Structure formats: structure tokens, C-alpha cells
Amino acid sequence: MTYNLNCDISNSFYRLAEVEVGKHLYWEIAGFKLHGQVFIVSWLVMLALIIFALNGTRKLNQIPSGIQNFMEYVYEFLQDIAKNQIGEEDYRPWVPYISTVFLFIFGANWAGALIPWKLIQLPEGELAAPTNDINVTVALALLTSISYFYAGISKKGISYFSRYVQPTPILLPINILEDFTKPLSLSFRLFGNVLADELVVSVFALLVPILIPLPVMTLGLFASSVQALIFSTLSAAYIGEALEDHGH
């Protein structure tokens, strides 16, 4: 009896520590193969954020307390990111986008770090943070690219593209290349950090007792939060750059 119990605990522990890279649960929809585990965890993260937002705004009081107070603090924090990077005049329309990006990445990273997804068996692949899939981080980076192009064109019209030849036409290739490197740096930075953190924790859990990786997991939670902050801050900075008046 004791032996069987120890075996069960040991098997659960090794499932937590197991490292799988490149395996996915594929859903085929209209001829396209989608990474099913990414959608599952993403939906759960979005559901948790929606429930949290509804609870925080259900009964608003003039003097905030409890979860409403926390929600207002988070909103002011995210509003400050947009204001500082985009500017007092133009930041308000972009607060929802910057907030959504930050909260999704933050929730996805923490879900991957805190929840023992590996104990849930799938036919193929495993549940994990959506942000450890390069497709997700590239999609988020492309959304930011579309956003700052939209911001610049909506404010300046076709004259927005004059920025590519400023301060001199010689810089045209470099300025064009810069717009390609922005989404690349955003996506690979987030993907690399999240994937590396999960691999490090898994390897430590495999090599040493379960309590030893806890400091590494704590560091991973901190790093995950920082990555959400970096991504949202850079997104706001790129949008602010697109809205900036280069003629002054």
C-alpha cells in the first residue's frame, strides 16, 4: 500500500518535471492545423480576466475598497504606462489596447508558472503558458505593428511615411528595416524568456527535490511580470513614436 502510494507520488512528480519541446495537440479546422493546447489555456486566461473584471466592477462605490480598489490601482498603473510613452494628448484611445496586452501576457505567464498543467494528460503535447508558443508572441507583436501603423496613418495620413526619409533619404533602408525588427524583437524576447523559464524549472524539478525549485519559480514569476511590462511599455512607445510630430 505504502509502495503504491509512493509510486503514485513519484509518477506525479516526474510528470511535473517532464520536459517536452515541439509537441502540440493539433486541431484541424478548415484545412488549418491549430495548436489546441494554446487555445485551451488562452481561453481559460481570458475567462479568468473577464470574471475578475466583472467582480471588480459589479458594485462600484464612491470610496473604493477591496477588489474595486485593486482594480482602480491596476487601471491607473496601466494608464500611466500609456500616458508616459504616448503622451498626454494622444494616450487615451490606446489605454484599452495597452491594458489588454499587459493583462493577457501577465495572466498567460502566471498561469504557466503557477498551475501544474502537466498533470493534465493530453493525447499529444501538454498544456502550458500560451506565450511559450512562438505563434502567440508573433501574433501579439504583429498586433502592435498594425496598431502603430494605424496610429501614424490615422493622425498624419499619407505623410506618415515621410518619416522614412528623415532626417535624410540615405536612412530609408535602415528606417524600413527598423519596422521589421520591432515585431521580431518583441516576439522573440517574450517567447525566449517564457520558454527558458519553463525549461529551467522543469530541469530543476527533475534533478532535485520538489522544494528546491521554488526559489527558481518565484524568480520566474517576477521575470514573467517584467516581460508583460516590457512588452506593453514597448508597444506604447512604438505607438507614441508613430504619433510623434517629426517636423518639430
From Swiss-Prot:
InterPro entries for the chain: ATP_syn_F0_a_bact/chloroplast, ATP_synth_F0_asu, ATP_synth_F0_asu_AS, F0_ATP_A_sf
Keyword Transmembrane helix (UniProt): yes
Gene Ontology cellular-component annotations: chloroplast thylakoid membrane; plasma membrane; proton-transporting ATP synthase complex
Major localization class: plastid
Membrane topology: Multi-pass membrane protein
Family annotation (SUPFAM superfamilies): F1F0 ATP synthase subunit A (SSF81336)
Localisation per UniProt entry: Plastid, Chloroplast thylakoid membrane
Keyword Mitochondrion (UniProt): no
Keywords: ATP synthesis, CF(0), Chloroplast, Hydrogen ion transport, Ion transport, Membrane, Plastid, Thylakoid, Transmembrane, Transmembrane helix, Transport
MF (Gene Ontology): proton-transporting ATP synthase activity, rotational mechanism
PROSITE patterns on file: ATPASE_A (PS00449)
Listed transmembrane segments: 34-54, 95-115, 134-154, 203-223
Record's function text: Key component of the proton channel; it plays a direct role in the translocation of protons across the membrane.
Entry's family note: Belongs to the ATPase A chain family.
Complexes and interactors: F-type ATPases have 2 components, CF(1) - the catalytic core - and CF(0) - the membrane proton channel. CF(1) has five subunits: alpha(3), beta(3), gamma(1), delta(1), epsilon(1). CF(0) has four main subunits: a, b, b' and c.
Name used for this protein in its record: ATP synthase subunit a, chloroplastic
Organism: Guillardia theta
Lineage: Eukaryota, Cryptophyceae, Pyrenomonadales, Geminigeraceae, Guillardia
Gene this chain is encoded by: atpI
